[in-house]
Regions:
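Short gly/ser-rich loop at a beta-strand->alpha-helix junction or flexible surface loop bordering the NTP-binding
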Residues: 1-123
Length: 123
């Protein structure tokens, strides 16, 4: 399974991660070259339980053809090269946007509490 969580889904996963440990202990990374998300339904359900993700799960899609999603997925198209060091690897092959990238992705829809939480992680 390979998946990159973005937007609200990444923020939810980072919140769970922060409750378990220090998000700062997780180094920033870039997505592997040629990264394509290939998580199946059972794997997505496991991530929902593990990280408290609400539907739709927001993920990165590098190719237009792979943007077609299941009802539980909302895919966002990005050029990962422009987001070097913009991800945190939560577990092998499961990435989430870094707090800084989450802030950029969500700045128009964050409430004040989530904005402050993100700013705290970025400090």
């Amino acid at each position: 399974m390979k998946i990159a969580l973005t937007h609200r889904s990444a923020l939810e996963a980072l919140s769970v991660l922060a409750a378990r440990s220090d998000v700062g202990n997780f180094p920033r990374t870039s997505l592997p070259a040629g990264f394509v998300s290939n998580a199946g339904a059972a794997q997505i359900e496991r991530l929902q339980r593990a990280y408290g993700l609400r539907e739709p799960i927001q993920t990165l899609s590098c190719a237009a053809a792979s943007r077609r999603g299941r009802g539980t997925l909302e895919r966002h198209r990005f050029n990962p090269v422009s987001m070097a060091q913009g991800f945190i690897e939560l577990e092998p092959a499961v990435f989430a946007s870094s707090p800084e990238l989450c802030f950029i992705q969500l700045c128009n829809e964050l409430d004040i509490v989530d904005a402050i939480r993100l700013l705290g992680w970025m400090a």
